């Protein structure tokens, strides 16, 4: 490994740089008309730093709804483009929802127990805010005055084009939330509360970005890892490391802290310990094999 402090050599390397290294901005962002500011959550600080005018927030996962909420509270007109999302209450049955997910064992589900691992590793972040007991979802935002539109499908001649599938996307998120709460209730042994379905109002399918209505676009479209510096053939065509539970095809090269590495909670702070213990055993076995091989070679 070449660094600004010299070259390091090691028989094993663990990549713990995570999956949220750089913002994942879609290529159609280059079609945004001149004069409109584009910013990602990584570069956003507060509403006062944005140019005057309305704000179009692209993406309705954790960052998207939090920023839409803050911007609207500051007095900005906000339009929120909603794609696939994971609706989630902050609290359920008197406890934080993460307590239920952990206690019921849902976060302990292993990577070899799911039918579609690739999809499970790319599930959007839950629609949660950090304020205790405060839920912010599409109903809350819409009732407050945030305009909801469908997923951004394209930009043509300065007009943002939105998908017409918003009702179906929201209905699916509501359905999945209901299934999750049913699972928690089955573990708890009693039925709990249920939440009103997402209320849909008529959503425009287009927005003229040249009209002056929008001054800023916030690309809350997630993050991606950046392993471009890794000169080892373990990356797929998208630049993501191919691995089996953190073990790559390159002997001695491991990953940790990635989404659903070995468990649903792998990318959470309290989820790394179990993964680390299992990977350490594999790593130790690799080192033992190296020592044994060197010993046999020397003799």
Where are these regions (language model features)?
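Flavin (primarily FAD) cofactor-binding/catalytic cores of flavoenzymes
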Residues: 1-299
